């Protein structure tokens, strides 16, 4: 293992192997402890995309909220559907919601807000690329979730995990923003393992991962965008050897996107080289 890989493995907290029952108990306990230590929290808010990550986090949150209510703590899980117009995989979103069984479902179509933002910028002389418009979608989705959380005395739960965090494969202040990130410390295959253990439909954790933010490239697979497979990323995070080419791609993503893992730099915290 290279020196940088060792540093990254320590930072990303991924275990070489997990016991599903123990891991789920630990994840639920983290969520419950956070709620119990912040008496203002009356709701937990999460956007549901129909993908592996939000399905897993949604199920964990609902299980945690159920237990909290049994313990006398009043709180609600609000699952949010955030389509941009008509969502291509809307059936999988509904399948995920049936599996999660959330207390409440809110639907907000982000298309009018995103399109208006893009148009307003265009009128100001700022013409966004399709990729940049994709980031607008991600930020609008998170803005909506925080608005709901503010209205309902809640917090926003994130879906960031270590295979995503290492690559910076999320929008800064978009899907990378949240109050808590329960599944950080898991890689992609471990997330699949937990969903299988929880009895999720295979379609939800065996589907090809995609951020699906670009109009010009609908359902673009994450692995195509990253230039490396999740299998390689997971192996790297577990301290296993990967090919020199895979190592270079992974470490380049890690270094280039370091700013996404930090709060806004100050003159005291900027890591000058």
Curated annotation (Swiss-Prot):
Protein residues bound to Mg(2+): 53, 164
Listed binding positions for deamido-NAD(+) are: 139, 172, 179, 259-260
Which CDD domains does UniProt cross-reference here?
A: NAD_synthase
One biological process term in Gene Ontology:
NAD biosynthetic process
Which InterPro entries does this one have?
NAD/GMP_synthase, NAD_synthase, NH(3)-dep_NAD(+)_synth, Rossmann-like_a/b/a_fold
The superkingdom listed in its UniProt entry is Bacteria
- Stated EC number for the protein is 6.3.1.5
| Pathway assignment | Cofactor biosynthesis; NAD(+) biosynthesis; NAD(+) from deamido-NAD(+) (ammonia route): step 1/1
Q: Which GO terms describe its cellular component?
A: cytoplasm
HAMAP family cross-referenced by the UniProt entry: NadE_ammonia_dep (MF_00193)
**Name of the protein described by the UniProt record:** NH(3)-dependent NAD(+) synthetase
What's the encoding gene here? nadE
